[in-house]
């Protein structure tokens, strides 16, 4: 294993931050860990997850690990993260699931959400069927986070749910993107 991080969140109950009473929280870090690795782990516990993910990518590169694609979950596939990865001297392309929410992408058809893009591409007859994966898919290049990205949308079966993938590799085909991202599912 190269690196890992453990993060805490405040939670929803204000009287039990992180699910702990004030007494339990106080006892948790009672020893002095100055100058030890434990001190670093305590600091990163409250650190923003996207910031830590960037640090981990930099650390992997520093350790000599080379990779073409950075596989990311939909939680990390946001404008700030994509912008950071593409603006750095990190020579890799993120491939990540996207949420089909309210995020708007600049398309040739105007600013549209993922669901609106799917409807538009379906209406224009730009969705294709992939016999290998037995799914319907469509591809579009859009502007997102001040950079051009390629979006792939796919669904299995007639009543299947649409899923979205985002990448900055403009040469990537749908089949290759699916196979690359499926490596992430295999490791989970």
What are the roles of these predicted feature ranges?
Residues 75, 171-172:
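Short, surface-exposed acidic/glycine-rich loop or hinge patches that mediate macromolecular interfaces
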Residues 5, 98, 169:
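Residues at the C-termini of beta-strands that transition into short coil/loop
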Residues 104-106, 173-176:
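Short acidic/glycine-rich loop or secondary-structure boundary segments that cap or lie
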Residues 17-159:
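An internal, acidic/charged active-site-proximal segment
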Residues 176-188:
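Short amphipathic alpha-helical "interface-anchor" segments enriched in bulky aromatics
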Residues 1-19:
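Structured nucleic-acid-interacting core domains from mobile-element enzymes and related host factors
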Residues 163:
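Short acidic-hydrophobic catalytic motif
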């Amino acid at each position: 294993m190269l690196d890992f991080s453990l993060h805490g969140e405040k939670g929803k109950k204000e009287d039990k931050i992180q699910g702990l009473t004030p007494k339990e929280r106080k006892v948790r870090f009672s020893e002095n860990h100055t100058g030890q690795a434990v001190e670093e782990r305590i600091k990163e516990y409250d650190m923003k997850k996207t910031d830590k993910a960037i640090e981990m990518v930099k650390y992997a590169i520093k350790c000599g690990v080379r990779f073409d694609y950075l596989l990311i979950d939909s939680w990390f596939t946001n404008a700030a993260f994509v912008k950071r990865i593409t603006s750095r001297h990190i020579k890799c392309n993120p491939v990540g699931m996207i949420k089909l929410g309210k995020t708007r992408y600049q398309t040739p058809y105007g600013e549209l959400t993922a669901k609106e893009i799917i409807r538009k591409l379906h209406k224009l007859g730009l969705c294709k069927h992939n016999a290998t994966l037995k799914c319907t898919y469509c591809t579009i290049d859009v502007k997102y986070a001040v950079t051009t990205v390629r979006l792939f949308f796919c669904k299995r079966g007639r009543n299947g749910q649409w899923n979205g993938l985002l990448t900055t590799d403009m040469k990537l085909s749908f089949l290759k993107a699916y196979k690359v991202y499926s490596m992430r599912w295999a490791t989970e």
